[in-house]
Amino acid sequence: VERTLFSKEEREMRKLAPLFLVVLALALVQCAPPSTPAPEPTSPPVEEPEDTPVPEPTATEEPAPTEEPAEQVLRIAFDASDLSSLDPHFAAATQDRAIVDMVFNGLIRYKPGDISQFEPDLAKAIPDPTTEDDKQVWTFELREGVMCHPWNGNEGYELTAEDVIYSLEKAANADRSAYAGEYTGMTFEAPDDYTVRVILDQPLSPALFLPKVTDYAGGFVVCKQAAEDLGDEAFKTHPVGTGPFMFESYTPMEMVRLAANEQYFRGAPKLTTVEAHYIPDISSRELGLREGELDLAEGLREQPWIEKMTGAEGVTVDVFGPGETVVLHMNQSVDPLGDVNVRRAIAYTLAREDFLAFFGEDTADALYSPVPVEFLAGGLTMEEVGEAGVIYETDRAMAQELLAEAGAEELELTANTSERASYRRTYEAIQDQLKQVGITLNLEVVDHSTMHSLIREDANPLVVYIAWRPNADVFLTRFYHSDSIVVTGAKPDTNFSHYTQIDDLIEGARVETDPDRQAELWKEAQLKIMEDAAAYPLFILKFVFGRAEYVDFGYDLMSTLALYPQITENTQLTR
C-alpha cells in the first residue's frame, strides 16, 4: 500500500483554505454594526485623554495583512518502518543515527560533509595528549553556556563536565551501551565544571583516540539530569542532548518530530522543524519527492534508481561516501559452519562481480578485506589478498568438493534479513548464488530494527552486515575480537562469526606507536580472518538520497559517518 503524507483531496483543500479565510473575513466586516463614536469634549480632562473615534475601514483603506515569516519545515523519509533506539549509545540503523546526529554533540566532531577533518564541538579546542604517571591523559576544556534541551516540563540547563563524565561512563558500560569495548582501559575525571580528563592505561595515537570522543557512536554526550529522570528505556524514544534540534514528539511507525534549538551554541537553526518519516516503500518515497510532499528521502543504492530519479523534475540525487562495507559473517558456533571447509565453500561460491553489476558503478566498489583500503590505513589491496591465496575467486566446482568433504552436500540454512533494500537484495543475491552449489538459504524478511535485535541474539548462521567504522582498530575490535562476540562475549558487540584467533594482533596494533608497523599488524590480522573464512568481504556501498533542489545543506557534501546527508543549523529551504 502506498504511503503518502497527504491525499490528493487534502492537498486541494489546503490550496483553497487561504481563499476561504479571506472571503469569510470580508463577510464579517460587512455584517458588523457601525461603531458609535463618543462625543468629543470641549476641554479634554488631563486624566481622560481624548478618545478619537476609529472609522470603519473601506475596502480601499484596509491595510494589507502583515505576513509572518514562513516556517522552514524539512521533511525527510527513511527506508524503515520505525525507529529502533534514539539513545546515541545504542543507535545503529540509519534512521536512528540520523536523529541522534541532529540532537547530540561530541567533545569534537567530524567537519560536516568531510570526515577527513576534525573540529572542536563541545570542547573549545582539540588537545594534545600529555603523560602523567606513565599514563596518557587527554584534557578537554568545555565551552561555557552550552544548554541541554528542556524535557517533559523540565527547563534546560547548562551542560558541564559532570554531564560529559556521566556520558562517557555510560558509553563504557556494557549494560548501557553497544560501544563499551571502545572505552576499555579508560577512566574519566572532572577537575572543575568545564574541564574533562580522559586517562588511558595504554597510550593511543590521535587517529585511534579522537574518534572515541567525536559526534559518533559512544562519543555523543547525553545530558545527565534528563537521562536519569527519564530512565534508560524512555530515553530510547525521548533523547535529550545539546544539538541544533531537540526532540518534540514520536508517533510509532510514522514520524519523529524535532524542533529548532533556539539556544544552540552555534546559533539558532535556519530550519524551524525537522520531520523524520518512516516510509519503507520506495514508491511512496519517490512519489513524495516528485509531488513536493517530501524534501529529502533515502533512495535505493542501485544504478537504475539513480538514473531514474536524476531525470525527475526538481529532484537532485546525492551519492556520497565513504559508503559502508558489506561483509558476510559466518557463525562458527553453528554446525556445520564450524568446519572451515564449509565456510571456504561458501566463499568460493560467491561472485563479487555479480554484486557490483547489480548495484551499479556509481554506488558499489569491490571489497577484498574487512578494512577498506581506499579510505583507511591497514586495509588490504586485491593484489595483497591474491598473493596470500585468500581471495577466493569464484570456483563452484571447488566449493562442491569442499562441501562433499565436510558431508554438507545438502546444506539448508535460515537467516533473517532486513526489509531495507540494501540488505534484502544482498541476501537474495547470496541465496541465488548458494543455490548453484546445492546450499538452500531460506530468508525471513523482518523490519530493520528487528533484524538488528535478532542478529545480536545470535539468530543467524549467516549475517550480512553493512557498516562503516572510523579506523581499522574499530573494525577489527568490534567485529573480530573475542570480547565482542554476540551474547557470550565479555562486551557483546558485533562479532557474529564467534571468531577468537586475532585478539593478540588487534591489541598489539592498538598500542603500536609506529604507524607502519601498526598497519602491518592490522593486515596480518585480516589475512588470518580470510584464511579461516570467518568472513567474506563483498563490496562497498555508497549512500544515496534524493533531494528537492531547494534544499541547501549549508555545506559541501562529500562524506559523512552519520549515514545520511547531515542536517545542521545551516541547512535551509530556499524556495
Regions inferred by a protein language model and the residue ranges of each:
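Gly/Pro-rich hinge or "lid" segments in bacterial periplasmic/extracellular proteins
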Residues: 111-113, 204, 212-269, 273, ...
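Ligand-site clamp/hinge motif
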Residues: 233, 261-307, 431, 440
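N-terminal lobe/hinge region of extracytoplasmic solute-binding protein
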Residues: 77-131, 169, 240-242
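Aromatic- and charge-enriched surface segment that lines or borders ligand/interaction sites
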Residues: 125-176, 197, 288, 336-338
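Detector for C-terminal structural segments
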Residues: 251, 349-380, 419-432, 453-575
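Alpha-helical secondary-structure segments
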Residues: 75, 160-166, 193-199, 243-244, ...
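Surface-exposed binding/hinge segments that line
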Residues: 141, 176-226
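Ser/Thr-rich, Proline-interspersed low-complexity disordered segments
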Residues: 26-68, 574-575
